[in-house]
Amino acid sequence: ALPISRGIIVDNKGVKSYFDYSWSEQRERSKIYEADFDKDGIEEVAFIMAGGHGTGVSVERLIIFLLMDESGQFIAYEFTGETLQQEFEKIYDFQVDIGNWELRVIKDGNVERILDWENSSSYYRDGEFQIDYLNLISYEILDEKILMNMEVCIWTNIGGPGKGFPNDGGKFCFNVAYENGMFRLE
């Protein structure tokens, strides 16, 4: 069984705020950063923790803790997979050319890059596959900037690990803008 940590308690000068998060420390340690991420003159706390790990999956979670008011209580905002997907789809789209085993990455109506997945064509069965960009996600903090790295993969109906493109244009890096509990990819 994996060791599981449960709950986060933020203690601000004796005022405690509890957040019901759980995570496994089996693979990576959680990381905590303090900076003024939204440039409002007040420092926030960023908590990066393991969200999911397995064959073809490595997801980190990003949570920002913000001092709510003079009471000393904190509130937590998580950059959820749903929000990440909405933000990604505002910037990028995909076109698939099965005949040439290509995945075209579209930005602003133009092909930004072409990912060749011919090497994984033996996994392609009955026309079933899925383009995935939510299973390989990591974060890093540099000064007051939050950076997110993600990879695009092709998942097929065999249910095994997907074909990734880490060295062939399948990696994406974004600045994650945070303001008033909202996250945006830039």
What spans do the regions from the language model cover?
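Surface-exposed loop/turn elements that mediate protein-protein interactions on large endomembrane-trafficking
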Residues: 5-22, 64-79, 115, 179-182
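Extracellular-facing segments of soluble proteins and assemblies that are Gly/Ser/Thr-biased and enriched
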Residues: 42-99
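Structural motif
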Residues: 53-65, 158-172
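Beta-propeller blade termini
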Residues: 28-37, 135-142
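Short aromatic loop motif centered on NTY/YTY
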Residues: 75-167
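Acidic/hydrophobic-patterned starts of short beta strands in beta-sheet-rich repeat architectures
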Residues: 37-49, 143-151
